[in-house]
């Protein structure tokens, strides 16, 4: 469990039985069956894999703790995201289905790619960008990312490293509510919302 930014943690998952992990395509997700204390039935949730499929020893998922609704602060925060961020301990065993999902990158195509994402929605795109950069495939990629500010800019350093390593990646970051320490041209390129 690694703290990223704000209420986001990345979880590095390894098989408890020592067997190889099933491969995945960049952009796919894991389905979790969670046994959360106080719940009468298991809770099923899906979270995107947020790292390259070229790391066969672990899966990484990055999960934001969902707060109560702004207009209903007396409501509880997100059940499964709170479980992951506040209760899950190292060496806990989770029930996970093999990677699945149809939102994945066709690594054989030569067509240009345009991604539009915001906040924690960056996770499947990050998996795809990392896989593309590691493979050396020379496809034009445009990524428009919307974030509130630098305090919530998830995986900023990894994105910047990918942008430096891949000359075909055109990263455009938009901060909707920049903070004093956020510098346009360094931390983000545009003010406002991605639209």
Predicted ranges, named:
Residues 56, 138, 164-166:
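Short, well-ordered coil/turn elements that cap or connect secondary structure elements
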Residues 144-195:
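Reductase modules of NAD(P)H-dependent flavoproteins
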Residues 97-111:
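A short, basic/flexible loop-to-alpha-helix module at the beginning of a structural domain
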Residues 49, 122-134:
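Histidine-anchored nucleotide/phosphate-binding helix
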Residues 1-92, 147-149, 174-178:
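Ferredoxin-reductase
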């Amino acid at each position: 469990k690694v703290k990223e930014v704000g209420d986001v943690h990345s979880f590095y998952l390894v098989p408890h039985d020592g067997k190889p992990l099933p491969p995945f395509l960049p952009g796919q997700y894991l389905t979790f069956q969670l046994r959360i204390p106080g719940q009468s039935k298991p809770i099923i949730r899906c979270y995107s894999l947020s790292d390259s499929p070229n790391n066969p020893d672990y899966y990484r998922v990055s999960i934001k703790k969902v707060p109560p609704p702004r207009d209903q602060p007396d409501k509880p925060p997100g059940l499964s995201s709170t479980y992951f961020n506040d209760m899950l301990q190292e060496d806990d065993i989770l029930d996970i289905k093999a990677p699945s999902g149809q939102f994945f990158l066709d690594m054989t195509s030569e067509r240009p790619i345009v991604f539009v994402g915001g906040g924690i929605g960056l996770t499947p795109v990050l998996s795809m960008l990392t896989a593309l950069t590691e493979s050396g495939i020379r496809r034009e990629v445009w990524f428009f990312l919307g974030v509130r500010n630098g305090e919530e800019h998830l995986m900023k350093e990894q994105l910047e490293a990918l942008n430096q390593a891949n000359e075909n990646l055109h990263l455009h970051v938009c901060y909707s509510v920049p903070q004093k320490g956020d510098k346009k041209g360094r931390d983000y390129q545009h003010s406002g919302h991605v639209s």
